[in-house]
Amino acid sequence: DNTAKEKDSPANLSLRTCAAGDNAEQPLDPSRNTFDNAYYIALQRQAGVLFSDQSLFTSAR
């Protein structure tokens, strides 16, 4: 049955999973609506969420 195979194709699974497309928000910081220092503490512990943030924090420049 080709219908079942097409339904579970990688392209169709991607469309269902990523329905919002490029504009989908990812919950990288669950406390983003409140100001806290958890972001900076994580960087100090070498546990930054994004590699770019951690690199900027540890850069000597």
Swiss-Prot record:
Transmembrane segments: none annotated. SUPFAM superfamilies: Heme-dependent peroxidases. One of its GO terms (biological process) is response to oxidative stress. It catalyses: 2 a phenolic donor + H2O2 = 2 a phenolic radical donor + 2 H2O. Its cofactor is Ca(2+); heme b. The keyword Heme applies. It comes from the Eukaryota. It is an enzyme of class 1 (oxidoreductase). GO terms for cellular component: extracellular region. Residues 1-32 are annotated as: Disordered. One of its GO terms (molecular function) is heme binding. Keywords: Calcium, Glycoprotein, Heme, Iron, Metal-binding, Oxidoreductase, Peroxidase, Secreted. Glycans are attached at N12. Removal of H(2)O(2), oxidation of toxic reductants, biosynthesis and degradation of lignin, suberization, auxin catabolism, response to environmental stresses such as wounding, pathogen attack and oxidative stress. These functions might be dependent on each isozyme/isoform in each plant tissue. Belongs to the peroxidase family. Classical plant (class III) peroxidase subfamily. This is Peroxidase 1. It comes from Vitis rotundifolia.
